[in-house]
Amino acid sequence: MVRNLKIAIPNKGRLQQPTLQFLQSVGIKPLASDDRALIVPTSWEGVQLVMIRTEDIPNIVETGATELGITGHDYVIESSADVEELIKLDFGRSKIVLAVPQTWRENSVDELKGKEFRVATKYYNIAKEYVRRRELNAKVVKISGAAEVMPSLGAAEAIIDVMSTGTTLKLHGLKAIDVIMDSYAVVIGNRNWIKNDEADRINLLLTMMKGAIAAKGKKMIFMNVPDNKLDGVINSLPAMLAPAITRLSRSDIWEVITVAEEDILPEVIAKVKAAGARDIVVIDIEKVVK
């Protein structure tokens, strides 16, 4: 019987939906009949999703309870878990910032030197290291809820928290004066995953994930080209779009296949059509496996 591989993913929050969408692009779709289920079978036989708090995922993966996990780079750093970041994903981008009241005259962290203040944060370890490194006279107050409201409540004067656009900070009368680190979603694994009995299956999962990432934003273009137009069509393609060329059963027609980024697709189609290509078909690419 095949042992289930487990992937820990966020059970809620800003990373949950992008994570599920990414996994579906890989071909891993949850099959839970109950939204409250915490261990969920998937469309990929032998692969289960485990719904866990985002901040707990690094520690869970470190123990080996799940083979892989998807979480934020910020939580990997905060947890100090002994895990390996295997794939950097293209969602969940944010910054961890130091924010202070807009009424403060200080606009940089250097201007805070010598000033006593409290800073509320759920990133306790990151904050402690930051305060030490920047030689600030600040007391770190650990919280688990919304940091933005803490200055208004009088629980702290400043916060260290995640920022995507800065809108929430402004809404609460705060301004970011320093970026502590950039964050993004990552696929993580136990340091010993390569020694795992299921290493081949794990590696296949990672390969398919990388393939889905590589395919994002790319389109495959098929076109028929008369023999006397072939050179013109080939020369009209951007240099990076090296095409595959096959002579069809009609000896005077060639099939040309190429791949283009979605943002230059209209330009490519216009050029090849003007050069003599016809019967142009464009399809999505699900994965590019290298």
Curated annotation (Swiss-Prot):
List the Pfam families.
HisG, HisG_C
What is the name listed in the Swiss-Prot or TrEMBL entry for this protein?
ATP phosphoribosyltransferase
Which reactions does this protein catalyse? 1-(5-phospho-beta-D-ribosyl)-ATP + diphosphate = 5-phospho-alpha-D-ribose 1-diphosphate + ATP
The molecular function terms of the Gene Ontology recorded here are: ATP binding; ATP phosphoribosyltransferase activity; magnesium ion binding
Which pathway does the database say it acts in?
Amino-acid biosynthesis; L-histidine biosynthesis; L-histidine from 5-phospho-alpha-D-ribose 1-diphosphate: step 1/9
GO annotation terms (biological process) = L-histidine biosynthetic process
Q: Which EC class is the enzyme in?
A: transferase
Q: Name one GO cellular component term.
A: cytoplasm
Q: Where in the cell is it found?
A: Cytoplasm
**Activity regulation:** Feedback inhibited by histidine.
Known cofactor(s): Mg(2+)
Per its UniProt entry, which superkingdom is the organism in? Archaea
E.C. no: 2.4.2.17
NCBIfam families named in the record: hisG, HisG_C-term
Task: Tell me the protein family, please.
Answer: Belongs to the ATP phosphoribosyltransferase family. Long subfamily.
